[in-house]
């Protein structure tokens, strides 16, 4: 009888705690709307030079920037090709524009685009080959975006 009473007491205590503690509000619309987006930066590490995958990531980054969040995109591996002024970028039917156009508007609207120097060299790109406003990433500078207070990191 003692074990059953102990079990029931534990169960009732658990239920009481479950209903006594307020629900988390990390993802409800009111909490997100009332947070200061400018204090919640996003760092996106982009690794794919594929036009459609790149467009999706850049479109997401630009939408996040438009919500007021500071956004920095680090283009590395073959994603550096997304910032090239010339060269083919396939435009699929679901894409409203090619990646370089999204990047240009993203920069114009205040977003930061960082490039991997060794990756550019690997693909034969120079700074003059890139759309205006792209910055070279470098040790210490790039990490400033990654480890900024409240920053979130996303790899695309």
Which sequence ranges carry the predicted segments?
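Solvent-exposed loop/turn segments at secondary-structure junctions
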Residues: 49-51, 78-82, 113, 119-123
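Short, glycine-rich nucleotide/cofactor-binding loops
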Residues: 37, 42-55, 83-88
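A short aromatic-anchored loop/beta-hairpin motif
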Residues: 106-114, 121-123, 127-146, 151-152
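Single-pass membrane-anchoring alpha-helices
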Residues: 2-28
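A glycine-rich helix N-cap at a beta->alpha junction
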Residues: 91-117
């Amino acid at each position: 009888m003692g074990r059953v009473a102990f079990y029931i007491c534990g169960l009732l205590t658990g239920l009481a705690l479950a209903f006594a503690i307020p629900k988390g509000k990390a993802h409800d619309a009111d909490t997100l709307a009332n947070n200061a987006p400018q204090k919640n930066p996003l760092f996106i590490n982009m690794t794919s030079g594929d036009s459609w995958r790149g467009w999706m990531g850049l479109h997401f980054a630009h939408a996040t920037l438009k919500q007021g969040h500071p956004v920095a995109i680090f283009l590395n591996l073959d994603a550096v090709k997304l910032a090239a002024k010339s060269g083919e970028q396939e435009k699929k039917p679901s894409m409203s524009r090619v990646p370089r156009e999204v990047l240009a508007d993203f920069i114009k609207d205040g977003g930061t685009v960082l490039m991997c120097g060794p990756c550019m060299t690997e693909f034969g790109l120079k700074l003059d080959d890139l759309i205006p406003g792209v910055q070279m990433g470098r040790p210490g500078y790039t990490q400033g975006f990654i480890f900024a207070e409240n920053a979130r990191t996303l790899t695309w």
